Amino acid sequence: MELRVALCQVHAEKDPGKNLLRLEDIVRRTDADLFVFPELYLSSYGGSLPKGFLDTAIPEMQGLCSERGCAVCVGAPVEDDGLRNSQFFITADDVHRYDKLHLARFGIYAENQYTAGTSLTMFQWKGMTFGMEVCYDIMFPEIHRAYALAGADVVISSAASAGPSRQFMERIGPARSLENTVYTVFLNNIGPCGDDKFWGGSCIYGPLGDMKAVADDGECVIVSVISTEEIARAREIRHHLEDLRRDIDWKV
């Protein structure tokens, strides 16, 4: 099984309507199965959505997915027992939502207004099993490992990562993929962030930690192929999940 994944590294404006229109334009003119957009893309990082925006935007995106035979993964703030930093995986028939578990409250990041999520989100689509996480979550290996042990093939890691975090993000992504023999689809914001800027660098890491596709520090849409066959080959080479000592409690 193969899927064409579009890394949609585009700047989010403070106008949610414009962001949605741009998303729709990209989906209509790009040949891909899955379109991944950054953390909080619909509102922009630090922005907000008009009341009821998602009530119409999500069905609109579902209609687009039906028209194009694709899925869209996109970030947006959601009011649900507090404000959530959420990532949606939208298909013609289903809507899956993940709420960011680990909120960034340091440096230039201002996420004190959000309420942290409490659970993981995993689902199947077109013959592959997906999990989601958001930005700072990737620093916590338990998330990738939990998804992998539950049978995930791909972990989508949307982000709004600015300059100071780049050195850490570029180290951790390949490690998460390799130690769990899964694809990691990392999709970062681009453009200004206060006195700094989002650095882009969106990429796909293969199940052996190798980079399959990478964006530069500007706006772009890059399409790359992921496959279950490559995951199977990787797990024949590296037996990390098979050899994991699940009989040990791992508490000191």
Give residue spans per PLM region.
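Active-site-proximal beta-strand elements of phosphoester/diester hydrolases
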Residues: 2-14, 97-99, 129-137, 156
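Short, flexible loop segments at the rims of nucleotide/cofactor-binding pockets, characterized by
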Residues: 11-15, 49-53, 108-112, 131-135, ...
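Cys-nucleophile CN-hydrolase/nitrilase-fold catalytic domain and related Cys-dependent amidase chemistry
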Residues: 13-16, 24-91, 96-97, 163-182
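Short, acidic/polar
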Residues: 17-27, 139-145
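CN hydrolase (nitrilase-like) catalytic-core segments centered on the catalytic cysteine
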Residues: 56-73, 139-220
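Active-site catalytic loop in hydrolytic enzyme cores
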Residues: 79-150, 165-171, 233-240
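C-terminal beta-strand edge segments of enzyme domains
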Residues: 122, 189-252
